[in-house]
């Protein structure tokens, strides 16, 4: 691929795996050849498995064991989820899961998921539709379709009481993480949740940053975000405390800001600001060909590639009352999970 002037990489989230190539349009067939070969006849061997196992084990140690705060989301996911697979990270719940991976496990997973019937192919750039159809038929047509994977994952039960975990770790500053369960990606509530996270923690103008970082100086940094999960995900508030600030003080301050949002409806101006910000993010994300291709693939996975051009209308339809109602729905103490990450003294 490099000799053809291109590059490739891949990533995996909790919901999908994305292999992607970038190369000159005149060499597009090289990408079809390589990706179809990967799907048709991936080379499985004990030697290659041992090599990749070692690489992933080192990645696990580097990012999740030896890195300060690296295990925060391992702990939070285990706290927040009881049955859904979101309860572990993509890389695995623990290092032993990677160390003990067997060749048959890898093969079975590959032939279950990496089949044409379960794949979405997006080609974006200076290409013609008929050219892409011809190349797809030539390179992927001969591969056995496989059996369609039906996503039937355990449904996480409604949380009925608050959960809390306190840990001591070798980190420079205390950290506070709190999550609440939110709606799935295609639910109407998803858009209200997305705007709520912007209101609370979307940058330096957000409520949490203005009050708890700039004004009260309880946190050195604080964010509010969600993961865009296909199934019901989490809204998270995540912050590092200023040295010397008591955890109880910081925790209470976050709760007070949440209660303000629940008690008093936001003004139209504040809502319009985060809607405009969301529109800008969507527009800028799709400026590059690679980002556009990834967006098309994701929306097709959601069921309709055309949503790429229409989804923003769902944000525009969210009103002040919707934000107020959704804040009161999810920011329930019984729906919360709190991780208090104490720096060892």
What are these language model-derived features?
Residues 1, 188-200, 208-212:
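Active/ligand-binding-proximal structured segments within catalytic/core domains
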Residues 322-325:
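Mature hydrolase/peptidase catalytic cores and their serpin-fold inhibitory cores, especially
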Residues 1-39, 71-96, 118-124, 174-184, ...:
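M16 family metallopeptidases and their MPP-like homologs
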Residues 82-83, 87, 115-184, 285, ...:
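An aromatic/glycine/proline-enriched structural segment found at the starts
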């Amino acid at each position: 691929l490099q000799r053809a002037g291109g590059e490739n990489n891949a990533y995996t989230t909790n919901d999908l795996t994305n292999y992607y190539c970038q190369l000159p349009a005149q060499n597009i067939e090289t990408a079809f050849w390589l990706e179809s070969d990967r799907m048709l006849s991936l080379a499985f061997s004990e030697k290659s498995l041992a090599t990749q196992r070692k690489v992933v084990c080192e990645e696990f140690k580097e990012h999740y064991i030896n890195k300060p705060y690296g295990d925060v989301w391992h702990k939070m996911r285990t706290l927040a989820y009881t049955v859904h697979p979101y309860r572990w990270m993509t890389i695995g719940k623990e290092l032993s899961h990677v160390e003990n991976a067997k060749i048959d496990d890898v093969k079975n997973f590959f032939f279950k998921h990496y089949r044409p019937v379960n794949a979405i192919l997006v080609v974006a750039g200076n290409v013609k539709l008929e050219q892409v159809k011809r190349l797809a038929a030539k390179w992927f047509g001969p591969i056995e379709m496989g059996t369609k994977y039906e996503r039937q994952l355990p449904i996480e039960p409604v949380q009925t009481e608050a959960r809390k975990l306190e840990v001591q770790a070798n980190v420079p500053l205390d950290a506070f993480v709190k999550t609440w369960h939110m709606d799935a990606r295609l639910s109407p509530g998803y858009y209200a949740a997305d705007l709520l996270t912007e209101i609370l923690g979307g940058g330096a103008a957000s409520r949490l940053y203005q009050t708890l970082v700039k004004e009260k100086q309880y946190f050195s940094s604080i964010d509010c975000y969600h993961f865009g999960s296909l199934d019901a995900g989490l809204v998270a508030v995540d912050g590092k405390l200023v040295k010397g600030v008591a955890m109880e003080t910081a925790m209470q301050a976050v709760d007070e800001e949440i209660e303000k949002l629940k008690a008093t409806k936001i003004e139209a101006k504040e809502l319009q600001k985060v809607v405009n910000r969301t529109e800008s993010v969507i527009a800028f994300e799709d400026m590059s060909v690679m980002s556009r291709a990834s967006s098309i693939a994701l929306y097709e996975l959601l069921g309709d590639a055309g949503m790429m051009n229409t989804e923003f209308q769902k944000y525009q339809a969210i009103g002040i009352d919707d934000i107020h109602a959704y804040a009161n729905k999810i920011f329930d103490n019984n729906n919360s999970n709190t991780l208090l990450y104490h720096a060892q003294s």
